[in-house]
């Protein structure tokens, strides 16, 4: 509506929570899709097409005006319409300008009074470099992790006490009691044997020396008579005053013992099950980091490789300081990775012991409290180093939640396209991140190779080989001339397969056929199906063999058909679903149809038989590792979540 009378009464607070990107999520369900901020208080909630938490806030508080955080339009609940006007002080215009500046991290625009928006923030990077905000969220991470520990500890204590009351629990309790009694008896027998040996030794030392060797031999007991003498002495010197009382048999005492005992208790935080805090529309980054950390080969590479000290060494060499530090830590060398395709098995993901913290294991890593939450202090920013430290935190078994400030800061500096708090595409971020990591490894390995230890150079080379080949596959593009049946083959590399939906899902009508779930195998079949090229547009080499290269005769164009097939499978297969269709001339909308897929995928029907004939049947089987899901109806806004298989916990 053109004029809303409720806008004139608006008095916007200067310290509104909407100015903090970390608050751009629903306080009730934590979604970042369709987030509305109340303009009368600091409440932020989701819209009516999600869980209606913003509408419920209006019904409870009677605050009529709310602003959509991403699209920046204002809605009045009392007028039940969108608001186009502003108040006399122009607060809505200023608020929109401020939010746009925060998203793009560009504070050079001016307000109506001529002041720049830079004065509204404390540093160039706004909240990402604000030490107070970082410290506040770091304390929240600690509090959340402590609460997680306490809840799981209390829950485990309750379930252990409850299990002891069941018939199976009583049976197990009795078995444990018998084992403890048997262990107690074995311990007492061991102590008696030690006491007997000590007394025999004291008697032998107190015996006066003999001059005759014959008498010395007589004093030495023979092996045949040693066992009876030990048995007699065992009976003679059995202690009777230090016997322990029998184990308690009362069920109440045993229940108390089980409830309070921390023995054999599993770690409260499963390694890898560490949440990444949304720092302001950063769900695209968090979801990608989660799936990369759950790829066993990729994770182990960056857990062993840390380029921070290497880059500092190269920087010192570039400035003239070429002296090699003797304190440089040697790096472990990864096993050589072959180019042969191997499926991603769960048995491969049974990583070596890296547990520490809650599980009671010792940790040789650095202090986890200071690794990731703070932004990098070094002038030489390294994405490999940030992946190294972040994976250490996520797989330490200590943290239930961590704020990846340093990772976001590095992404902003090294990938400017993702700078700011605007919503981004997760697929594009994954491609850019892998590209930057690859460039960093190549640059580090080739600059001043004599200054880098041989073990570190070898490790960098192997990690670069894994990063380049873990997602790398090859496609066979085959064009068949319909005039002479000649086939032209071209090998093309790929790092992911972009799959389109079948034609029935590209119509705007609400037919029942288009609403049925789509199968992933159906989308793969469409990707590899034969496609007829429109018209006579193909210049066949076979049909033009008799024509000279510089002849004046026109090139013979024929009809043809094209087909894509996989000729080399990657170690990790990435499938990208193209969920958009054109509605009208220039409008795109999302295809919200559910896609069904199994836990295992057989890629043999979609491969070129000539290229993959030598492979075994199990080489075509892939196990599901991770899924990144986009929630939302449009492309301009939404929320990303990641579902990953965790080998430590046995589930996602």
Curated annotation (Swiss-Prot):
It comes from the Eukaryota. It catalyses: Thiol-dependent hydrolysis of ester, thioester, amide, peptide and isopeptide bonds formed by the C-terminal Gly of ubiquitin (a 76-residue protein attached to proteins as an intracellular targeting signal). Coiled coil: none annotated. One of its GO terms (cellular component) is nucleus. PROSITE patterns: USP_1, USP_2, USP_3, ZF_UBP. SMART domains: ZnF_UBP. SUPFAM superfamilies: Cysteine proteinases, RING/U-box. Keywords: Cell cycle, Cell division, Hydrolase, Metal-binding, Mitosis, Nucleus, Protease, Thiol protease, Ubl conjugation pathway, Zinc, Zinc-finger. InterPro entries: Papain-like_cys_pep_sf, Peptidase_C19_UCH, Ub_carboxyl-term_hydrolase, USP_CS, USP_dom, Znf_RING/FYVE/PHD, Znf_UBP. The active site is at 283 (nucleophile), 639 (proton acceptor). Zn(2+) 3 binds at residues 38, 41, 57, 63. The keyword Manganese does not apply. Zn(2+) 2 binds at residues 26, 29, 46, 53. Residues 274-652 form the USP domain. Its main location: nucleus. It holds the Pfam family UCH. Its EC number is 3.4.19.12. The keyword Zinc applies. Zn(2+) 1 binds at residues 4, 6, 76, 79. A zinc finger (UBP-type) spans 2-99. GO terms for biological process: cell division; negative regulation of ubiquitin protein ligase activity; protein deubiquitination; proteolysis. Residues 184-230 are annotated as: Disordered. GO terms for molecular function: cysteine-type deubiquitinase activity; zinc ion binding. Deubiquitinase that plays a key role in the spindle checkpoint by preventing premature anaphase onset. Acts by specifically mediating deubiquitination of cdc20, a negative regulator of the anaphase promoting complex/cyclosome (APC/C). Belongs to the peptidase C19 family. USP44 subfamily. This is Ubiquitin carboxyl-terminal hydrolase 44. It comes from Xenopus tropicalis (Western clawed frog).
